[in-house]
Amino acid sequence: MIDRLGSLFESAASMLPMSEARSFELFTEITNYDETACDAWIGRIRCGDTDRVTLFRAWYSRRNFGQLSGSVQIPMTTLNARVPIGGLYGDITYPVTSPLAITMGFAACEAAQGNFADAMEAIDATSITGSEHLVAWLKAVVYGAAERWTDVIDEVKGAGKWPDKFLAGAAGVAHGVAAANLGLFTEAERRLTEANDSPAGEACARSIAWYLAMARRSQGNEDAAVALLEWLQTTHPESKVSAALKDPSYRLTTTTAEQIAARADPWDPSSVVTDNSDRDRLLTQAQAELDRQIGLTRVKTQIERYRAATMMAKVRAAKGMKVAQPSKHMIFTGPPGTGKTTIARVVANILAGLGVISEPKLVETSRKDFVAEYEGQSAVKAAKTIDLALGGVLFIDEAYALVQERDGRTDPFGQEALDTLLARMENDRDRLVVIIAGYSSDIDRLLETNEGLRSRFATRIEFDTYSPDELLEIAKVIATDADSSLSAEASKNLLEAAKQLAQRTLRGRPALDVAGNGRYARQLVEAAEQCRDMRLARGVDIEQLDVDRLQEINGSDMAEAIATVHAHLNIRE
């Protein structure tokens, strides 16, 4: 029987230059009869059959490598079969001249299918003497498919000494790809640029261009990124390239060595075991800061409702239940000094504590951070500002100023910035929460400037003007935090001043709002501390002052402070 199969093999091999299709039929006839005919499986590979089953059968029968070809004295090199071993790094193939080459093709295929353990088992069972660089490359391919980027770097870091200069160049691509996925964009750019000039540059051009584009975009070199993306769209079009061209905010989703090491299953990127102690701490801090706020009863209730809805949505999703997807973006309306920025920090801690955003980051901004002086530049400036807040909360105070009123004319610069913000709120909704703040009527005017803006915000929280009693309590907290205290007379003077302002209007608004509410209380305490220090400094026995006298703000200190602050605010009696 070996003679008959050998004869068929000889015929199939001889037909390759003339009719690859006929050769494939003959090789298939052999494998249909004998599934362990390794050489015939390799012949099928030579004819373009690199199906997973074919690669498995060739690998499974690798111990019979060269048996049929040897029976008819045809070297296996005559077939010129090659197996793909590039993985995500490039269109790289390797000649099938040994059982090791078969193993390489099989393992690369299994890794692409997510069968990492089988791939590594096949590699580890291979004799590697003299072929250590091939095994290192193959492991880098498997680790890359599993997004184990630190292991990729470990396998290829010695590639400069590999005897195969082509694979050494490809290893540079693997190193650059791993660095990019770890967020090390400067290193990624260096490695990929060097690899582009290596013997493997052409075979790996697609991966090099993609990851270089992502690295340069993250470094702020958008023109260079777009040039590479346009080349890819022309030569290797695919959905992610189109998406990256349409959306300048498109970025790689990066990871860290710590996250990779924290996987419960080393082959599963989604199995990261999170240490929840930091999250619990953030939630505790958020609640403590919320409880510490004076007044704000309605605000506290709304924040608790927001927290509960967000938390329960995550619980329902974890159990496979349907979850509504309301926007996380928020509107804070109310006068200045009513705690909007403080509550925004509380929200950042809550969202980070619940795992909605990656860090408790609050980026405070205003119009100047979004709007440029020249047409076409506001989009760029706004994008850079938004990028700073990715993974956290973007807080825009006095947001109504983004688009200014100009005697009935549009504000093109502000509108350009607003359009950019609107797009990013949607495109980056999984890694960005936006809070806009300002007077209620002014925020409503802003929302009217763009039809899609109002629908982006599912939560609106109203902040009320503080009452005189609440301002007194705020002042006492501020004083205590500064190792000061208000005497009964000082408290009485401050409360009386606040009550008088509560009954007045200034420039068409409640006087307490013009004074700044909580900021007004802080200004009074700080001015009173200066008055106290001046009074004590005039004494002749400074060294003998006890703690109580150093802390106490008396009635005259506060009365003088009120006069000073009111004069500064242009508030007349």
Curated annotation (Swiss-Prot):
- UniProt GO molecular function: ATP binding; ATP hydrolysis activity
Q: Where does ATP bind?
A: G334, P335, P336, G337, T338, G339, K340, T341
CDD domains recorded: AAA
Please give the superkingdom of this protein's source. Answer: Bacteria
Tell me which SUPFAM superfamilies the record gives: P-loop containing nucleoside triphosphate hydrolases
| Entries under InterPro entries matching the protein | AAA+_ATPase, AAA_lid_6, ATPase_AAA_core, CbxX/CfxQ, CbxX/CfxQ_RuBisCO_ESX, P-loop_NTPase, T7SS_EccA, T7SS_EccA1-like_N
- Name where it's found: Cytoplasm
Q: What main location does UniProt list?
A: cytoplasm
Q: Which GO terms describe its cellular component?
A: cytoplasm
Q: Which UniProt keywords apply?
A: ATP-binding, Cytoplasm, Nucleotide-binding
Q: Does the keyword Signal apply?
A: no
Query: Subunit structure, per the record?
Result: Part of the ESX-1 / type VII secretion system (T7SS), which is composed of cytosolic and membrane components.
The family assignment reads: Belongs to the CbxX/CfxQ family.
What is the designated name of this protein? ESX-1 secretion system protein EccA1
Organism listed in the record: Mycobacterium leprae (strain TN)
